[in-house]
Amino acid sequence: MHPRPEHLSPTLNHNHRLKLKQPATTSRMLARTILATLVSAACFATVNAQTCSATNAVCCQQLQDPDNLNADALNLLRLLNINPNTLTGAVGLTCKRLTEACFACLLLTRPGTSLVSGSCNANAACCTGNNYNGLIVLGCTQIQV
């Protein structure tokens, strides 16, 4: 009879049931798999929960309140002959289509998580107003990740 590897040697737990010891690498692999599954599920659950259509979902470097626009946003609006007092919703600056990479960056660096340190220079938003080639986008609502 061949000896059993040490990591599979039987032990008794507190209920006197036979239990095999699992190698530490199995536990780490299981933890990583669970983490990846939860992150994926959170991505899909958040995106699917939004009522925003794919064409309106954007990733902007800045989202600004229309009542508190910085000089750059005000200058762009003037060039486009748009009165800032008529705006509803946030104003997105330097926006592009919301990609998986942008969404993952937002999800992994949001406050309260310890998955990745750092920050994203991005804000996920649903913008139903005019989009001026991503330079400035109107009628935005931030998507909570």
From Swiss-Prot:
Pfam families cross-referenced by the UniProt entry: Hydrophobin
Keywords: Disulfide bond
Single GO molecular function: structural constituent of cell wall
Induction behaviour: No expression is detected in sporulating cultures, nor in vegetative cultures or during infection.
SS bonds (residue pairs): 43-126, 59-120, 60-95, 127-140
GO CC term (a single one): extracellular region
InterPro entries hit by this protein: Hydrophobin
Family: Belongs to the fungal hydrophobin family.
Domain note: RodE has three extra-cysteines, two of them within the characteristic hydrophobin Cys pattern, and no signal peptide; however, its hydrophobicity profile is conserved with class I hydrophobins represented by rodA, rodB, and rodC.
Summary of the function given for this chain in its UniProt record: Aerial growth, conidiation, and dispersal of filamentous fungi in the environment rely upon a capability of their secreting small amphipathic proteins called hydrophobins (HPBs) with low sequence identity. Class I can self-assemble into an outermost layer of rodlet bundles on aerial cell surfaces, conferring cellular hydrophobicity that supports fungal growth, development and dispersal; whereas Class II form highly ordered films at water-air interfaces through intermolecular interactions but contribute nothing to the rodlet structure.
Subunit-structure text: Self-assembles to form functional amyloid fibrils called rodlets. Self-assembly into fibrillar rodlets occurs spontaneously at hydrophobic:hydrophilic interfaces and the rodlets further associate laterally to form amphipathic monolayers.
Protein name, UniProt field: Class I hydrophobin rodE
Classification of source organism: Eukaryota, Fungi, Dikarya, Ascomycota, Pezizomycotina
